[in-house]
Amino acid sequence: MLAVIRIRGRTGIKQDIEDTAHLLRLNRINHLVLLQEDAVTKGMLQKVKDYVTWGEIDVDTLEVLLKNRCLFKGRRKLTEEELKDVTGFGSYRDLAKALVDGKIKFSEINDVVPVIRLNPPYKGYEAIKTSYRNGGSAGYRGKDINNLIRRMIIPGVDLNGQREN
């Protein structure tokens, strides 16, 4: 399973690249989507590689992401009780394992918002106009996407930047 994060905005972007980002549901900076890895997805990612970063997400990071940032439609938090009713999985960990193993697609879960909003990363991005291979942030980063996601999930802070009680 791939985690894809948009790191650059819309200014000066070609229309076909913007359309591809829209098809990937990456309309704003710091939005994340979870995608299955296939030839079509790889082609789309190659087209928008200068505006997004992506890599393979692991079970631990996905569990933390589901627990802290995943929302139902209506912007309600995903709780353990509702998780069991909607997905049939008893815990976040079981759902994360099933998603990573490809047993279920994230888009198949009913009433879950397909785009996950994240905070800007702690200590910022590297150079957003430079590829990850050259010391920047854009493009494929493999397993290192997990470090970036963990820097973007700040426990105890809600989506509006307010401290949760």
UniProtKB/Swiss-Prot annotation:
Pfam families: Ribosomal_L30. InterPro entries: Ribo_uL30_ferredoxin-like_sf (IPR036919), Ribosomal_uL30 (IPR039699), Ribosomal_uL30_arc (IPR005997), Ribosomal_uL30_euk_arc (IPR035808), Ribosomal_uL30_ferredoxin-like (IPR016082). It comes from the Archaea. The keyword Ribonucleoprotein applies. Keywords: Ribonucleoprotein, Ribosomal protein. GO terms for biological process: maturation of LSU-rRNA from tricistronic rRNA transcript (SSU-rRNA, 5.8S rRNA, LSU-rRNA); translation. One of its GO terms (cellular component) is cytosolic large ribosomal subunit. GO terms for molecular function: RNA binding; structural constituent of ribosome. The keyword Transcription regulation does not apply. CDD domains: Ribosomal_L7_archeal_euk. Belongs to the universal ribosomal protein uL30 family. Part of the 50S ribosomal subunit. This is Large ribosomal subunit protein uL30. The lineage of its organism: Archaea, Methanobacteriati, Thermoplasmatota, Thermoplasmata, Thermoplasmatales.
